[in-house]
């Protein structure tokens, strides 16, 4: 992966990395790259290799899941400063959702193999990064739960037939 000068500064200004030391940010930047997706582009697909995670710098991304027989269900919409992808942390390292750019989106990707290697050698960095990801995972779980309750709730008082 090519290290682009200044990615550590972009990471430094992103809220997800707030409070991390300059040394930690430089280490993370060594695994980082800029990526741009156009509206409609798939960033990743459920079941694919979870080989990165992303910080959203600009744009809108939909997190979706297949929900037969309804087709794709949008679980969450992510915007600037949101973090996308935690499946790179958990074997077998497969995406559990789809991610699609709704608008042109600029992201910083962080290579999972590079990151896991860095985290294995730096337990302080691992602690700081994993602590942040617990919040991301809890947020996705909550969003998934709410959306699934809505999708499968069926008709009831004040609800139309689906």
Question: What does each model-found stretch correspond to?
Answer:
Residues 1-162:
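Cytosolic regulatory regions built on CNB/CRP/Popeye-like sensor folds
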């Amino acid at each position: 992966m090519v290290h682009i000068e200044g990615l550590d500064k972009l990471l430094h200004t992103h809220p997800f990395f707030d409070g991390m030391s300059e040394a930690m940010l430089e280490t993370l930047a060594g695994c980082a790259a800029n990526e741009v997706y156009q509206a409609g582009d798939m960033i990743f697909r459920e079941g694919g290799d979870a080989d990165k995670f992303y910080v959203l710098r600009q744009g809108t991304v939909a997190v979706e899941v297949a929900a037969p027989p309804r087709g794709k269900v949008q679980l969450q919409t992510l915007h600037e400063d949101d973090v996308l992808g935690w499946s790179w942390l958990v074997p077998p390292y497969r995406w559990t959702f789809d991610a699609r750019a709704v608008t042109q989106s600029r992201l910083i990707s962080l290579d999972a193999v590079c990151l896991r290697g860095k985290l294995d050698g730096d337990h302080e960095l691992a602690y700081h990064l994993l602590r942040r990801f617990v919040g991301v995972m809890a947020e996705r779980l909550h969003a998934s739960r709410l959306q699934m309750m809505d999708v499968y709730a069926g008709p009831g008082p004040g609800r139309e037939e689906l």
